[in-house]
Regions:
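A short Gly-Trp-Pro
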Residues: 1-133
Length: 133
């Protein structure tokens, strides 16, 4: 069970599934939404995610995409698309070290002064689809 929430504690969540798609995204939308040079995300099935306290504010940042954040302190919490999955900001976890990133995505939009030096795979856009078996 993964648990986390916003800076002020008004909004809390739990994720009852193993995380996947652990990444650091460098796209302009994520950077702007979080106010940082990149943002670490992990994904869980939407059915395994629930809000435990508070109700986050929501903003449709692009067609089919809903970003949720604390209306009190502004902490960015989730990104929901149309795949039945929810991306959660890794650093909003109570223990963010428990879910390390596996790669960097959208590095074509990476800021020139944001140097990646961790040796993880880096993809200019999203990560490539798994090879067909």
């Amino acid at each position: 069970m993964l648990a986390g929430g916003c800076l002020c504690g008004a909004v809390r969540y739990q994720a009852a599934a193993a995380p996947f798609h652990e990444t650091v995204c460098h796209c302009a939308d994520c950077r702007r939404a979080v106010g940082a040079s990149a943002v670490a995300w992990f994904t869980v099935p939407l059915s395994a995610f629930r809000w435990m306290a508070g109700t986050p504010a929501a903003f449709q940042s692009s067609p089919g995409v809903m970003r949720r954040f604390c209306a009190v302190c502004g902490t960015s919490l989730t990104y929901e698309g149309a795949l039945g999955e929810v991306d959660v900001t890794t650093c909003s976890l109570d223990d963010p070290a428990a879910v390390p990133p596996r790669d960097h995505t959208h590095t074509a939009a990476q800021l020139p002064w944001d140097i990646i030096g961790d040796g993880l795979p880096a993809y200019p856009q999203g990560r490539p689809a798994p090879a067909e078996a």
